[in-house]
């Protein structure tokens, strides 16, 4: 059974998601003992530098039309992962992530299910984030949706995954109608992949088959949204946590945020966190 990670890297404005995918791929090569493959999905106009391609397992052109062509926030193609993945077992990631610790042992646990959505995330201190608050997850709470994070989402090529991604496609293409009909207690104004995946799980009635809320260590990520970090009020200036918390980075396996060494897949969110110095350090660790 082949295994690997997958991301979509579509640049938007001055945000270089392809460079983030490169850093993610380097971090996987530097830290994972077994599964370190990363497939990167790009639109037809994206030119992938040769040094990037060397660390990507596969570069896949996003099939059919580019649903995100006219979108500033390039998430509209996120229903296509099932069709783009070259692996039997796949974990979907967000591009703005790095892996400081080895999570290869998670794969055998994840493979017990056909779908497994991350529903618990960590603060920078490694504590369980109290993200069942109203700040980021208001519409999940009000509509009793599973607390899905598509920044770490496992699927296996299977009948259940096929059915799931067919519904995900339908919701993506008709998201306003679905949100209006099936989220009576409030809905986001914009398309959200987390909401779409959660709604598909709810509509199919497969929450027990695809989530394990009481299991907080596998799978999980450190999620650097500012206001789930459980710090004293006023400690963060705004959503850019990097303005308030320092990072101490000498190598990927030991870097610290605010004096706490990172160990879980690290979703840095603030794109300015990934500096050229961090990328250079990753390159030196891999080559």
Stretches with model-predicted labels:
Residues 42-48, 99-102:
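Short, polar loop motifs at secondary-structure junctions
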Residues 81, 152-154:
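Conserved hydrophobic/aromatic beta-strand scaffold that supports enzyme active sites
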Residues 46-85:
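Active-site-proximal specificity loops/subdomain of glycosyltransferases
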Residues 61, 74-127:
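GT-A fold catalytic core of metal-dependent nucleotide-sugar glycosyltransferases
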Residues 117-140, 275, 283-285:
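A short, conserved beta-to-alpha structural element at the edge of catalytic cores
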Residues 1-22:
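N-proximal low-complexity "stem/linker" segments adjacent to membrane-targeting elements
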Residues 1-7, 40, 54-55, 140-152, ...:
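A glycosyltransferase accessory/donor-loop signature
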Residues 27-35:
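Short, acidic, metal-binding catalytic loop of nucleotide-sugar glycosyltransferases
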């Amino acid at each position: 059974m082949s295994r690997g990670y997958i991301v979509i890297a579509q640049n938007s404005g001055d945000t270089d998601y392809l460079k983030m995918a490169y850093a993610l791929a380097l971090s996987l090569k530097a830290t994972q003992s077994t599964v370190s493959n990363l497939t990167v999905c790009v639109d037809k106009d994206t030119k992938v530098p040769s040094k990037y391609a060397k660390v990507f397992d596969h570069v896949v052109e996003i099939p059919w039309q580019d649903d995100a062509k006219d979108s500033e926030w390039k998430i509209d193609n996120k229903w296509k992962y099932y069709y783009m993945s070259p692996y039997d077992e796949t974990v979907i990631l967000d591009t703005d992530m790095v892996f400081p610790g080895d999570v290869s042992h998670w794969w055998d646990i994840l493979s017990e299910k056909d779908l497994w959505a991350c529903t618990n995330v960590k603060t920078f201190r490694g504590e369980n984030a109290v993200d069942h608050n109203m700040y980021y997850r208001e519409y999940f709470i009000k509509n009793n949706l599973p607390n899905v994070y598509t920044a770490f989402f496992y699927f296996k090529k299977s009948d259940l995954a096929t059915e799931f991604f067919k519904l995900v496609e339908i919701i993506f293409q008709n998201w306003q109608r679905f949100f209006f009909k099936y989220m009576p207690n409030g809905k986001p104004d914009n398309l959200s992949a987390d909401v779409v995946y959660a709604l598909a799980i709810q509509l199919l009635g497969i929450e027990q088959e695809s989530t394990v809320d009481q299991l907080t260590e596998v799978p999980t990520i450190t999620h650097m949204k500012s206001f789930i970090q459980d710090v004293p009020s006023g400690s963060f200036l705004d959503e850019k946590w990097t303005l308030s918390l320092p990072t101490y980075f000498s190598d990927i396996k030991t870097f610290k945020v605010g004096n706490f060494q990172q160990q879980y897949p690290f979703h840095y969110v603030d794109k300015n966190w990934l500096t050229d110095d961090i990328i250079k350090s990753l390159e030196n660790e891999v080559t």
